[in-house]
């Protein structure tokens, strides 16, 4: 059999995972997933994590477990630092990886449309950490509101 083509997929969101699942069926490819986290999570349910209805473990699944049955997939936890197209390599904070094909599946970034005060004050909810931060802020404000001596203070904490 010919040598496997090296495919590096940076980003383990829906797009990256779906591509990897399709490519993994073809043994001509050896696939490396690079992601900053060692788990995939289901963003549509982040609001339930932030409201304490479910725990983060209910919406996250380890990449290594997801692909443990596949011999042509490996996981590299790290952050993309640099792409070297001439050398067909990428550099991460945890080493250099060679590729024949590179897929950048990095997701989205919130656009605050230049409103720095909104960016500073907002409680975003795009990651599990952000959902937990929102949850903790909500719970702390509710606790503080129960001890507030004035209605205006209670309203400020609850709105």
Task: Give, region by region, the residue ranges found by the protein language model.
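FAD-binding core/adjacent interface of flavoenzyme oxidoreductases
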Residues: 2-4, 73-158
């Amino acid at each position: 059999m010919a040598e496997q083509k090296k495919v590096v997929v940076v980003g383990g969101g829906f797009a990256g995972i779906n591509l990897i699942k399709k490519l993994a069926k073809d043994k001509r490819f050896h696939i490396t997933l690079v992601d900053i986290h060692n788990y995939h999570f289901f963003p549509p349910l982040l609001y339930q994590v932030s409201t304490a209805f479910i725990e983060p473990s209910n919406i996250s699944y380890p990449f290594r477990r997801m692909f443990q049955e596949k011999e042509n997939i490996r996981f590299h936890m790290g952050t993309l630092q640099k792409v070297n197209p001439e050398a067909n390599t990428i550099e991460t904070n945890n080493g250099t990886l060679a590729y024949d094909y590179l897929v950048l599946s990095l997701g989205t970034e919130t656009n605050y449309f230049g409103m720095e005060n909104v960016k500073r004050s907002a409680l975003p909810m795009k990651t599990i950490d952000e959902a937990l931060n929102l949850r903790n802020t909500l719970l702390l404000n509710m606790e503080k509101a129960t001890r507030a001596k004035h209605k205006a203070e209670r309203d400020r904490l609850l709105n």
